[in-house]
Amino acid sequence: MRLTGSAPSLRQHTITAPVPAWRHPDHVVLETCVEDIEGVRISARAGADRAELGDNLTAAGTTPSIGTIEAAIFAAAEQVEQRRAQAGAHWADKPEAAAPFGLRILIRPRGGSFVYDADEGRAMIADVRRIATLALEMAEFTRPQATGGGRTTLPPAVDLGFVVGALTEDGTIDRGLVRLLVDMANGAPVTFHRAFDQCRDTVEAYGDLEGLGVRYVLTSGAAQTAADGASVIAGLVASGGPTVVAAGAVRPDGLVDLVESTGVREVHMRCPREGLTPNEPQRTDEALVRRAVETVRAVPLPE
């Protein structure tokens, strides 16, 4: 697949270099999975570190609209700015206040399998490019203003990234497509989603993803739940490649055991309101997010 042109750089707008201390949390990271703008707002307000934003979560998620993404960036930025304002004039010296909110956008053109044809691959690449362009356009609205004029070196309010996944017919990573998606992200963090759990050989797939520049791997250890796949997750963590994010029926009550049994430093979970049907919007339960945040903050980081 040949592409013309180059991707706009997110690095200079959402990731400052060298990476300062606030980029490395001293606690287990909690990432929520949400379907709407309010879910992003709730996650940021309740203290989650990141949110993955996708549409149609009952179908395992698809790419949200560009309008939804823009509004979600603003919603997250507003919550971060409120937190920083509450921390006072020297918020930049306080890690919890300074930390940007991570927003990860799901790139998936349809439900069903993770094997994509050339047209679907082009659509995914175009989505990443368009979202990257949007991030550039919005950068001035989501980055703190420098005092006295000039370019600011303060951390941005929102750390934007992408969640992707593509396989071949034989159950291996579609290296060509994933490489193009990572290249188009051009420095923004890229997560490989739970298509990973459908790979025929997770160890081989994990090595492939490291070579492709993927920073995070979302996985249940190729099991129905993260708890059931704990041994596989632990093995991946021990191998020291991309950051492993444990996912799959993760609940607040099981977070301590999951972290202790796997050594993961990052977890991913949905926090839906009770009683929702598949035909209803998958709203986020703020109380559940807060409970999960309190739990992970109390869990000692694995050695």
Where is each model-derived feature located?
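C-terminal alpha-helical cap/extension of soluble enzyme domains
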Residues: 2, 10, 108-112, 150-153, ...
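N-terminal amphipathic alpha-helix/helix-capping segment at the start of soluble metabolic enzymes
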Residues: 2-33, 88, 92-96
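Hydrophobic faces of well-ordered beta-strands that scaffold small-molecule active sites
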Residues: 28-32, 51-53, 101-107, 162-164, ...
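Catalytic cores of alpha/beta
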Residues: 35-45, 113-133, 200-212, 236-240, ...
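Active-site-adjacent beta->alpha loops and helix N-cap segments on the catalytic face
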Residues: 37-38, 57-79, 119, 168-184, ...
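A structural motif
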Residues: 48, 135-136, 156-159, 187, ...
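Alpha-helix-loop-beta-strand connector modules within alpha/beta enzyme cores
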Residues: 63-111, 175-192, 231-252, 286-301
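Glycine/small-residue-rich loop that forms an oxyanion/phosphate-binding "nest" at active or ligand-binding sites
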Residues: 65-83, 91-175
